[in-house]
C-alpha cells in the first residue's frame, strides 16, 4: 500500500502507479476517519459489542453512505475488523497506538498541512513560505522534515500508519508539482545540471534542491555534484510512453485534491465539493478523463477484444447491432467492430467525449461500422428491442444507487428478447471488503456524487427485477465482465483466451 523506501524497477512501477491513483485517497481516508471520531467510536476488537455501519454513522453524526465508503476501505486495510455478522470493531494494534498522546498529536498537526501542500509549486518557485487559509506555511521545510528526517512512532504499526496518513498524499502532490514544472520531462532527456533545471522549470535554488532530495529519497533521482538524473530504475520504468501516461494520471488525481481536503464535510453532510452531477463540472472532468483513457487505449483494447471473443463463443456477432453506452474512448465498441466486420456499433456519450471517441474509431479503421449518438446518460430513452448487445463500460459507477433501477429498465427495454447486456465494471466481493483497488475506485465515486460499486449478487438482484434473470460474472485483469440476459439465453461461463493466444 504505502511505497517502499527504495524500490527495484518492478516495485518502483507499482509504487508510481499507487502514488498516481490512490495515495492521496489513502491519506484522506485516514485523516478524515480521525477527524470524524470514527476510530474512537468503534469498540476495540474483543472488548465490546461490534457495531453496524448505520449505528456507527449515527454515533459520529455522518451519512451512512459516507461512513460506509470509509469503513469498507479500513476493513480491507485491516485497520478495522468486520465479523461474519458485519459488525465492526477497531483492531487492537490501531487502538493501542491511537492511545499514545504524543503520536496522536503528531497526526493532528500533520492533518493541518493538506491545503498548504497544494501550494507546493508556488513554494518551489519562490523558495519561501506560502499563504494558505490566512496563515504562512513553510512547505519546503515540511517536506524535508517529513521525508528526510525520522518521525518517531510508538510501534512499527504506528510508523506504517503515519506513513500512509502523512506521506502518501505528499508523494502524490510532489509528483504533480514535478510534472507541472516540467522537471520530470527534463530529467527524461538525460542528466541536467542545477542551473539548467532552474532555468527550464522556474524553480528557486532552495525549491529545486528540496524536490530533488525528496525524489532521490523515493528512488527516482540521483545527484552527483550539481548534476541530477533519473536513477537507472526510474529511467527504465519511465521510458517511452510511460512518463506521458504517468503525468496524465497525476493530472487526473490533482482534480480531487480540494475534495479530499474537505472529505469530512462530504461524509457528514453529502455536500460534494467536486460534484460530477453538475453539468459543467462533469463535461470538463470527463473530457479530460476520456483523454486519459485514450492514453491506455491499447491495454483496454486487449481487455475489450477478449470480452468480445468470449461472447462470440456462444453467440455469433455477424450483423449484430451494438450500443456502447458511455463509450468514453470508444474502446469497447471498437472491439466488437474489429471482432466482426459486419457488426454495427452505436457510440453513445456526451458530445465532447464523442469527439475523442470518433478519432479513436477512425484510427482503428472502424468508422464505416460506426454511428455516434450524443445524449444524456441519466435520461436517454434507448428505444425498444433495438440491440443485440448493449455495453455498459464502467458506466454504472457514475450513477447514484437510486438511479440504477431506472437505468436497467431503459437498457432492458432496448435489448432484443435474446440480447445480451455486457457490463465492464469493478465488482466487489460478497462481503464488500475488497478488492482494494476497487474500493478506492468506489471511494472516489462517492466523493464526486456518483455511484456505488456492487457485488455480483447485488447486480443480479437489480437485473432480475427488469427481467434479466440470467447473469454470469467473469474476472478480467483489473475489472470484471458481468453478462446478463433473459431466461433461456446462453451465456459464456469462461473467458476466451487473450487475443495473442487466440491468434
Located regions from the model:
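Alpha-helical subdomain
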Residues: 2-84, 93, 101, 156-223, ...
Amino acid at each position: 500500500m504505502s511505497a517502499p523506501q527504495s524500490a527495484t524497477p518492478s516495485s518502483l512501477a507499482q509504487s508510481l502507479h499507487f502514488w498516481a491513483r490512490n495515495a492521496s485517497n489513502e491519506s484522506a481516508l485516514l485523516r478524515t476517519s480521525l477527524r470524524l471520531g470514527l476510530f474512537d467510536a468503534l469498540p476495540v476488537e474483543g472488548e465490546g459489542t461490534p457495531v453496524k455501519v448505520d449505528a456507527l454513522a449515527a454515533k459520529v453524526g455522518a451519512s451512512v453512505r459516507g461512513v460506509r465508503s470509509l469503513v469498507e476501505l479500513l476493513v480491507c486495510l485491516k485497520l478495522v475488523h468486520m465479523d461474519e455478522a458485519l459488525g465492526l470493531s477497531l483492531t487492537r494494534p490501531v487502538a493501542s497506538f491511537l492511545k499514545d498522546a504524543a503520536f496522536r498529536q503528531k497526526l493532528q498537526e500533520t492533518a493541518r498541512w493538506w491545503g498548504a501542500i497544494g501550494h507546493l509549486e508556488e513554494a518551489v518557485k519562490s523558495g519561501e513560505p506560502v499563504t494558505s487559509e490566512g496563515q504562512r506555511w513553510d512547505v519546503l521545510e515540511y517536506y524535508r522534515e517529513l521525508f528526510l528526517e525520522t518521525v518517531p512512532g510508538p510501534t512499527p504499526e504506528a510508523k506504517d500508519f503515519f506513513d500512509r496518513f502523512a506521506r502518501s498524499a505528499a508523494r502524490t502532490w510532489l509528483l504533480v508539482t514535478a510534472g507541472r514544472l516540467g522537471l520530470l520531462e527534463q530529467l527524461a532527456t538525460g542528466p541536467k545540471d542545477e542551473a539548467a533545471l532552474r532555468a527550464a522549470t522556474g524553480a528557486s535554488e532552495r525549491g529545486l534542491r528540496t524536490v530533488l532530495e525528496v525524489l532521490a529519497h523515493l528512488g527516482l533521482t540521483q545527484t552527483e555534484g550539481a548534476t541530477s538524473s533519473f536513477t537507472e530504475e526510474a529511467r527504465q520504468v519511465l521510458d517511452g510512453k510511460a512518463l506521458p501516461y504517468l503525468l496524465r494520471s497525476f493530472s487526473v488525481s490533482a482534480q480531487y485534491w480540494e475534495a479530499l481536503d474537505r472529505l469530512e464535510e462530504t461524509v457528514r453532510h453529502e455536500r460534494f465539493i467536486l460534484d460530477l452531477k453538475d453539468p459543467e463540472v462533469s463535461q470538463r472532468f470527463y473530457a479530460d478523463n476520456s483523454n486519459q483513457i485514450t492514453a491506455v487505449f491499447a491495454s483496454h483494447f486487449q481487455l475489450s477484444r477478449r470480452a468480445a471473443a468470449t461472447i462470440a463463443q456462444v453467440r455469433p456477432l455477424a450483423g449484430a447491432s451494438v450500443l456502447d453506452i458511455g463509450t468514453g474512448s470508444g474502446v469497447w465498441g471498437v472491439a466488437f467492430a474489429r471482432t466482426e466486420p459486419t457488426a454495427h456499433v452505436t457510440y453513445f456519450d456526451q458530445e465532447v467525449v464523442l469527439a475523442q471517441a470518433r478519432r479513436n474509431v477512425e484510427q482503428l479503421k472502424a468508422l464505416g461500422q460506426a454511428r455516434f449518438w450524443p445524449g444524456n446518460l441519466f435520461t436517454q430513452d434507448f428505444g425498444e428491442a433495438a440491440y443485440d448487445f448493449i455495453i455498459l463500460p464502467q458506466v454504472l459507477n457514475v450513477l447514484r444507487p437510486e438511479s440504477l433501477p431506472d437505468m436497467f429498465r431503459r437498457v432492458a427495454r432496448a435489448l432484443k428478447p435474446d440480447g445480451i447486456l455486457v457490463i465492464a465494471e469493478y465488482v466487489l466481493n460478497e462481503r464488500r471488503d475488497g478488492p482494494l483497488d476497487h474500493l478506492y475506485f468506489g471511494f472516489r465515486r462517492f466523493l464526486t456524487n456518483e455511484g456505488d460499486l456492487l457485488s455480483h449478487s447485488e447486480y443480479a438482484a437489480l437485473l432480475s427485477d427488469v427481467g434479466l434473470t440470467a447473469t454470469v460474472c467473469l474476472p478480467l485483469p483489473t475489472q470484471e465482465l458481468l453478462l446478463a440476459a433473459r431466461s433461456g439465453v446462453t451465456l459464456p461461463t469462461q473467458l476466451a483466451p487473450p487475443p495473442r493466444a487466440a491468434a
